[in-house]
Amino acid sequence: ISPFSYKLTPTAELVSPDDSDLIFRAQRSAVMPIMVVTNIFDEGFSTETLSGILSSPELQDRLIGNILAELTGKNYYGVNMDIEYIAPEDRERYNAFLERLTERLHNEGFIVMTALAPKISADQPGLLYEAHDYAAQGRIVDYIILMTYEWGYT
């Protein structure tokens, strides 16, 4: 079960959802709670907030530390990075961040996953697709969640 969501701030802090009761109930029912981190800021996904974090090793370290603190403090089993609308110029920085995050969390026994919009070609245009390196993320993280709901709402 994945409470939605921890939101990034421009200073790499996390705004927590009210998840304590849900985590308690999940664990009591032998269900693994997974933390979800998004780059939602104010009214929607923020390309700028994420870009600022990816441009700063210090902010990345702070974010990784904050994620780890929440994982251990609330007994989550891992994290799902639901990061959307990444600027194309941040593609490699995001891959490098995922590598650092995954290495650190694996050392502590946590799993890492990412959420990706499905696409029909490797060079599909659009901010939702261009900066995500699907092959690299497949190598870096433990699991990938395909957000098929991006193709329509029913």
Label each PLM-derived region with a short phrase.
Residues K7-T154:
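Chitinase-like catalytic core of GlcNAc-active glycosidases
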